[in-house]
Amino acid sequence: MARCCRHLAVFLCVLLMLSLCKALSSNVDDGYGHEDGSFESDSLLKLNNDDVLSLISSDETTLEASTVSVSNFGAKGDGKTDDTQAFKKAWKKACSTNGVTTFLVPKGKTYLLKSTRFRGPCKSLRNFQILGTLSASTKRSDYKDKNHWLILEDVNNLSIDGGSTGIINGNGKTWWQNSCKIDKSKPCTKAPTALTLYNLKNLNVKNLRVKNAQQIQISIEKCNKVEVSNVEITAPGDSPNTDGIHITNTQNIRVSNSDIGTGDDCISIEDGTQNLQIFDLTCGPGHGISIGSLGDDNSKAYVSGINVDGAKFSESDNGVRIKTYQGGSGTAKNIKFQNIRMENVKNPIIIDQDYCDKDKCEDQESAVQVKNVVYKNISGTSATDVAITLNCSEKYPCQGIVLENVKIKGGTASCKNANVKNQGTVSPKCS
């Protein structure tokens, strides 16, 4: 009997410790994710990030995985019926379901949507599968929010997967025709971003096609730990402001194996972007990869840790560009562009610290400091007489600019207020 009592006591202690671990994992991040760093209780028990994720995962696997399809909530998918409310109902169900959950947009159908917000936090939503087509309403009156069409926000540990068949179609022609950049007689008004990803952690976007956005195609804002791979983004070369991927206030991003051709920047990188890795990108038509514009309206801007390794630019207005306004402040630093091919690009390499997108900009002394920028193993042809432009600030000259094995045919170099070091074969050279 005594032995049985001892065994029972040990068993109860184990149960108590497991309960304590589960309680601690709940305190880390309310059960919806985890933060960087480790958690230490007042007791002798210590949990690191891997321990917390393990506890959460083991808790989820005890519940049955489920799929929530928009078809089960009344979505027709005929391309004509407004499916907005059906999507909202399906999202509410998926977001509140326990266990690993998938929000499913079925293959082979086209779902007409007005402006729609998919908001978290969610209990255990892990997959957003877009296997069919999301098609934007062409009625401008259907957009109460003129800045956004689809918004996904406040959801952690999520995969957005197009399965190579999923399409997001912004049907932007109506908006382009009414743009002041196309018709100077019309007032300049706002237009929606097709897909806004806001305040997300541990996000994976893959195997997705986005086309013909009303304005920006994909905007990544205030996110951390983002992976984008195998995406195709397209819009006509004359479509206004249709940036492919716009990144701001986001850290730890990787974009790889993607093809982007639009009427604006293939990738635009703005204030607050840190540790961005871009691999194996094809760009064109478009305005290339642009860091900036930074420092508009005399603002402070900070961008650092940008690495572009492996890219091809074809018939684009720019290749790799850094652009800042006069009057701004801050830094754009620790930037590397390498292993890049230019084919008939108008401005293959350009730093422009006198950028102005208005009729007239006043001369100002202050500027964003550009420093520690490396251009390595870049070759190809320029479509203009100037292949390399380094137009830096007089008061805050560009520092630590390195050109290594850069060979661009068909143009000269124009360099002003730039501290440049040449390594290997460089042509054309700054005089």
Swiss-Prot record:
Main localization, broad class: secreted
SMART domains xrefs: PbH1
EC number of this enzyme: 3.2.1.15
Tissue specificity comment: Expressed in flower buds and siliques, in the dehiscence zone of anthers (stomium cells) and maturing siliques. Expressed in stigma during pollen tube growth. Not expressed in seeds or in the floral part or leaf abscission zone but found at the junction between the seed and the funiculus at the site of seed abscission.
InterPro entries hit by this protein: Glyco_hydro_28, PbH1, Pectin_lyas_fold, Pectin_lyase_fold/virulence
Pfam families: Glyco_hydro_28
Record's keyword terms, sorted: Cell wall, Cell wall biogenesis/degradation, Cytoplasm, Glycosidase, Hydrolase, Repeat, Secreted, Signal
Signal peptide: 1-23
Catalytic activity: (1,4-alpha-D-galacturonosyl)n+m + H2O = (1,4-alpha-D-galacturonosyl)n + (1,4-alpha-D-galacturonosyl)m
Spans of repeat PbH1: 223-249, 250-271, 303-324, 332-353, 398-420
Classification via Gene3D superfamilies: Single-stranded right-handed beta-helix, Pectin lyase-like (2.160.20.10)
Record keyword DNA repair present: no
Enzyme class: hydrolase
Location within or outside the cell: Secreted, Cell wall; Cytoplasm
Record GO cellular component, one term: extracellular region
Active site per database record: D264, H287
GO biological process: anther dehiscence; carbohydrate metabolic process; cell wall modification involved in abscission; fruit dehiscence
Inactivation phenotype: Impaired pod shatter.
Record function comment: Polygalacturonase involved in cell separation in the final stages of pod shatter and in anther dehiscence. Not involved in floral organ abscission.
Family of this protein: Belongs to the glycosyl hydrolase 28 family.
PANTHER family: PTHR31375
Protein name: Polygalacturonase ADPG1
Phylogenetic placement of the source organism: Eukaryota, Viridiplantae, Streptophyta, Embryophyta, Tracheophyta
Gene: ADPG1
